[in-house]
């Protein structure tokens, strides 16, 4: 049974917390210097920094491949939608297309990367229901790119600064 607050909880800031905070901060600073919105790259960092490398690959991969599949699928669905309503503005059709797209998303994720369903669905919904007609392709591609940057940076940090390596360095 779920118990709140947990009896076994102890407040501490560990190496993973520090790596996540510093990496997200650095990615945000670089993005701000490039005058790009750092939100999705930072989210990629947070998803990509797991307890160890296998956990990072799993969680970062879920975010990356989900975003990739959801973003590309959103482009295709939006393209179909615009064949019927070139100016947009008909959300009922988008709702119907979303239902079909979610089935396709789940099938693609089951085949390529099963953990990608949730992040892929989020990207799909955001693109379909909150992206202007003029920018849906660029928006989708930017989300894929930014997520990839965040996840890749997180994986590199976790690879080059695993807990064991840092502990060994400080014990010298």
State what each model feature region is.
Residues 1-124, 129-172:
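Alpha-helical transmembrane segments and their membrane-interface boundaries
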């Amino acid at each position: 049974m779920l118990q709140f607050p947990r009896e076994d909880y102890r407040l501490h800031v560990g190496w993973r917390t520090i790596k996540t905070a510093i990496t997200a901060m650095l990615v945000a600073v670089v993005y701000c210097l490039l005058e790009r919105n750092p939100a999705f790259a930072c989210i990629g960092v947070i998803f990509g920094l797991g307890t160890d490398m296998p956990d990072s690959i799993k969680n970062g991969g879920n975010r990356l491949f989900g975003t990739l599949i959801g973003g590309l699928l959103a482009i295709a669905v939006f393209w179909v939608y615009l064949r019927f309503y070139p100016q947009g503005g008909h959300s009922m059709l988008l709702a119907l297309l979303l239902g079909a797209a979610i089935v396709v998303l789940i099938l693609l994720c089951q085949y390529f990367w099963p953990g990608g369903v949730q992040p892929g669905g989020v990207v799909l919904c955001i693109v379909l229901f909150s992206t202007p007609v003029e920018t849906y392709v660029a928006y989708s591609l930017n989300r894929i790119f930014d997520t990839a940057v965040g996840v890749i940076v997180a994986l590199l940090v976790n690879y080059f600064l695993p807990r064991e390596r840092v502990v060994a360095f400080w014990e010298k």
